[in-house]
Amino acid sequence: GKEPQKGASAILQAARMITEIESRSVFGYLSFNCGRISGGTGANVIPDSCEFSIGIRYAANVQYEEAIAFLKNLCEHVTVPGTSCTMEQNGYYPAMEMVDGADRLLSLYQESCKLLGEPIPQGIQQSGCSDTSFVTRIGIPALCSLGIQGAGAHSLDEYAIPSSLLVQCKKLVATILAM
């Protein structure tokens, strides 16, 4: 409008916050990604609202707690006069932390792969979401990413290789029988 200096830009505040949030990423430990942002009504109007979504990746549950504390603190200390911030958590997956018996389970799976003449996978721990994290959270060992093979997960280019399903099932059955 006529007096832009009287406005408080919610988008400017969001931009400052997003820059600060993403600068705190330490890949392999704790990382943040702003995957969506929306605000304002037009180029000639000081935006009075803005919202954005942050994805958080962590390998341990304590890192998630650190992330939430950091985000809450950031939200409580806005830097653009006349703006405010509210934070809403829209979902949570616990980290898939190592539990007793996980190494043994992986060894059984690797032996099953070897017996079937399949490549022997190496166990890796990475951040991200997995339904198995709810199982490991209560102390039950579990392995992740043992389903059908493919690529492009969660994208328009995602695909599965149907012929891999039988091989994957054989490896899982052999592992179960070895327990």
Whereabouts are the PLM-identified features?
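Metal-dependent amide/peptide-bond hydrolase catalytic core
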Residues: 1-179
